[in-house]
């Protein structure tokens, strides 16, 4: 059930990845208030959900920075502007507010939150992410207590018996990382070889040889054991059907994330190949007051880089200012002159 009174703000940013957070910062510098909606349970987009400890090399000023640390720094940067986050939900409906002055959009989320804003900045990347869930009976009973699809803090798994399922970078990287804190780490993969960086595969083999990781290959998940949402065991089966039971109190299935633009594709934005065409200079879409930035935005010569997305976020924010403050002049000034609004110089 939706709330009776819409939450009014200047800008709604759809997507809390690095480019979405950059858009929040740029809006804040222009004294525009933001609400942020994201389908994931924590800000950061792919950087948090898939590879928080992977280094990123192409952010200016950082020869190398872990993806999760970049998100932490972006969150620190937007904190003075107190954006309001609406996580674990999607925007499922968008409509123009009849008779609004200035013109406004009404957005409704999958949790019934209703927002009204003069501008919308879509920073949805490839779309709303959701995990590819293994087809196991009673899986839902353990989700959120013993089964998790992302790791935000590895300390939460200290002393735990962890089963990681999957054969890609996320599965291997977290197996390596959690081997330092977990009581036991089992890695279940249906193939004898892993699809990951060669250095990660070598490190995984080394830890397995040292007895710090148990490689359960080639096996697949078969069943979960436990009561009242508390996992006690994971049953796996090999290609011949022979079963093995693993003691476990945590299961981390890393089978990738499925991304889809979902309702965004129905908003009259001319979506092509899961991207939204925009005017490069402004990042405006085909509908006034709606902008797209980052990987979801497309124009001739587009480079899908974080750096490009940061520049697009700035362009979108400066143009959204005129939607939010019609008739008010925007005098461009460098941050070295203005400082950060609300923070003493």
Curated annotation (Swiss-Prot):
Co-factor remark: Binds 1 FAD per subunit.
A GO term, aspect molecular function: flavin adenine dinucleotide binding
Coiled-coil region list: none
Binding of FAD, residues: 38, 46, 51, 91, 129, 295, 336
Catalytic activity: 2 reduced [2Fe-2S]-[ferredoxin] + NADP(+) + H(+) = 2 oxidized [2Fe-2S]-[ferredoxin] + NADPH
Subunit structure: Homodimer.
Protein name stated in the entry: Ferredoxin--NADP reductase
